[in-house]
Amino acid sequence: MPSLPQEGVIQGPSPLDLNTELPYQSTMKRKVRKKKKKGTITANVAGTKFEIVRLVIDEMGFMKTPDEDETSNLIWCDSAVQQEKISELQNYQRINHFPGMGEICRKDFLARNMTKMIKSRPLDYTFVPRTWIFPAEYTQFQNYVKELKKKRKQKTFIVKPANGAMGHGISLIRNGDKLPSQDHLIVQEYIEKPFLMEGYKFDLRIYILVTSCDPLKIFLYHDGLVRMGTEKYIPPNESNLTQLYMHLTNYSVNKHNEHFERDETENKGSKRSIKWFTEFLQANQHDVAKFWSDISELVVKTLIVAEPHVLHAYRMCRPGQPPGSESVCFEVLGFDILLDRKLKPWLLEINRAPSFGTDQKIDYDVKRGVLLNALKLLNIRTSDKRRNLAKQKAEAQRRLYGQNSIKRLLPGSSDWEQQRHQLERRKEELKERLAQVRKQISREEHENRHMGNYRRIYPPEDKALLEKYENLLAVAFQTFLSGRAASFQRELNNPLKRMKEEDILDLLEQCEIDDEKLMGKTTKTRGPKPLCSMPESTEIMKRPKYCSSDSSYDSSSSSSESDENEKEEYQNKKREKQVTYNLKPSNHYKLIQQPSSIRRSVSCPRSISAQSPSSGDTRPFSAQQMISVSRPTSASRSHSLNRASSYMRHLPHSNDACSTNSQVSESLRQLKTKEQEDDLTSQTLFVLKDMKIRFPGKSDAESELLIEDIIDNWKYHKTKVASYWLIKLDSVKQRKVLDIVKTSIRTVLPRIWKVPDVEEVNLYRIFNRVFNRLLWSRGQGLWNCFCDSGSSWESIFNKSPEVVTPLQLQCCQRLVELCKQCLLVVYKYATDKRGSLSGIGPDWGNSRYLLPGSTQFFLRTPTYNLKYNSPGMTRSNVLFTSRYGHL
């Protein structure tokens, strides 16, 4: 009888014993497909033969995908790609070539396009040797040679194949009659007096990164290669025309010469670094700044020639892309530049697929930096793919359900409907531009942090230089795309293009006010809701789906950075939706006008002021009663609506006597108001000077000592404070830091000025402008106050026609000082709570959302006998109730 199986043992065929001594043993293994890690950036490098590209991909933490994978975040190819491939790319993908760049990378195309631009702007394009394209310009070349013979002059010409590379087929001639007329050749005048180094001729390989063509963005790498000839240079004559090692500087040619010197250092051998070359120039009393300026100008002007072709081809490949969207293309170009004996740069050629071979250590050092910094500038994030899919889904729903779309205006619509329609269109245009500006600010901040050895040369910071380049761009579009030049000119001249974020917000506010007046609603001065102090770490915001738990903060550095960018974008969207409530109130008026006036303005197609009856309510004394001021005329805004209250009107003039009496009484009333306002401003300044920021758990004296200690050791704390304020805190948290000061002021001012609403005080509106300036450019305004430009915020008053009195300016200066102290105390508290900012792990960057508790920071405000009880004490003022209980 067979025995029962033991419990838990499953009977079956006996397993094969693989540990046998048979001569053959199967070694076949099951292929296991490697899974992609969630949140990993992928790269397809099947199209490159250069190992340095793969090494940099690994160093960046990207995961290489199989050759057939076309969904990678990054695709790298050595050769140019077809336009169909670019058309098939998703928005989250990047490929390292632009369509249409061959217009300057092929020798014949470059010569043809440069010739056209030279005809239009001869004084701007003097850096290209005179060139002829054979066979089309064979006759012109022969005529030029005959003219030289008549003048008894003889020049040397260099002959190149039209689409050659690596020095193949290049020769020098002095007799132009011997050239064949039907071959496809490029003939250039030879630069006979080059700048020599140790007696050798050389050229420069400059690396250029183009990250976008719509709009154009160009970066220059501040290093490169100096490629020297391998025979001492002698001006060309009949006996040495064939000595190519003397006249050509191509590495692919000179490396075959026995005199080619390979050296591991950057200051010896036949190949050296541009970094060493600039030091050489400086040591020999040459102007290095002018050298880089000339190189930058040459590069930008050359790419301006390519821009019409590249932009047209790119838009054909990517139709329907909204302006300002991320470019799926980028390109690393190699510019070959020759210097003459006066250090003037001459453009030889441009390589769209520069060699990334690393035969020597100097190649590895330079080219690794070029690639590594370029990939960092691209800002490829793990969340790009997910956000792209979500955006596509939202766009599909919008098209399906007609969401957020403006209804068409029907024929025969009334004037009221036409005005509403124009306002809606204007608001949509402004919101789109606002989103573009915020994206651009975010990109520029990332570029400034990750530029490495690159420098942005277009668009330049110099306004005059930018205007010069834009004029050249307009000429280039007119020259190469004459049929589409008008549309490009309209884009270039769009008044919204040069506006900053705060200007667009002002225009949006204007449209909102016009809309409310058109609808017959009561217009209220709007501004951000008062926030009492710092946020709690557990109640920071309503998190989106991508931020489900705090455990996500423990991810890799690249993932954390992408999540940070994603949260920033989420906040931008949130701000955009609430744009009505985040607008800066502006009640400065210049001229007394009828409230019912309707005027054209840049802010909206038709400015409408509601015809409301005059109000009988009297308002408290403030600067607004003195004079009515409109917003200034500027390049970005030509006019703005009159926002004066309905009670300020022209008085009817029955006769000359009544008119004279009313003018005298009005002057006396304004004089009395001015004196009272100065007195109240002095009281405000006195209170502001006594205000102090208190460190949690410490006395006033101890808090002052902490601030003084930070200031005394500013060299040590400067970088840490900058990192905390500009990087670790986003714009929402920065605003909440300043709200500690702002809330205290909102509490004090009504008691001094004896008004129920602080918004009615002109000084508070000035304070609001200062707060907005301090938060300008993601907190850069406040940080400038710690630097040499500590009074840069005062420039906001230079552009305004409203006169700010010395007392008001002193109040603003004290306000800025309180904000600086507040930041230092919050920074110190965060440092003590978390430990040294420099001694913690990489996950510290995510602590930007973990700010100190809200009830621990406050301004100690002195108590004065102000004898005014606000009828509407808001919840945000609860911190100060105990201190003003006796009032």
Curated annotation (Swiss-Prot):
EC numbers, comma separated: 6.3.2.-
One Gene Ontology biological process: microtubule cytoskeleton organization
Residue ranges occupied by any TTL domain in the UniProt entry: 38-390
Chain positions of site Binds negatively charged residues of beta-tubulin C-terminal tails: R106, R352
Name assigned to this protein: Tubulin polyglutamylase TTLL7
The keyword Magnesium is assigned to this record: yes
Main localization (coarse): other
PANTHER family referenced in this protein's UniProt entry, alphabetically: TUBULIN POLYGLUTAMYLASE, TUBULIN POLYGLUTAMYLASE TTLL7
Subunit field text: Interacts with both alpha- and beta-tubulin (via C-terminal tubulin tails).
Low complexity biased stretches: 548-560
A GO MF term: beta-tubulin binding
Cofactor(s) in the UniProt record: Mg(2+)
Task performed by this protein: Polyglutamylase which modifies tubulin, generating polyglutamate side chains of variable lengths on the gamma-carboxyl group of specific glutamate residues within the C-terminal tail of tubulin. Mediates both ATP-dependent initiation and elongation steps of the polyglutamylation reaction. Preferentially modifies the beta-tubulin tail over an alpha-tail. Competes with monoglycylase TTLL3 for modification site on beta-tubulin substrate, thereby creating an anticorrelation between glycylation and glutamylation reactions.
Gene encoding the protein: TTLL7
Species per Swiss-Prot/TrEMBL record: Homo sapiens
Binding site for Mg(2+) 1: D336, E349
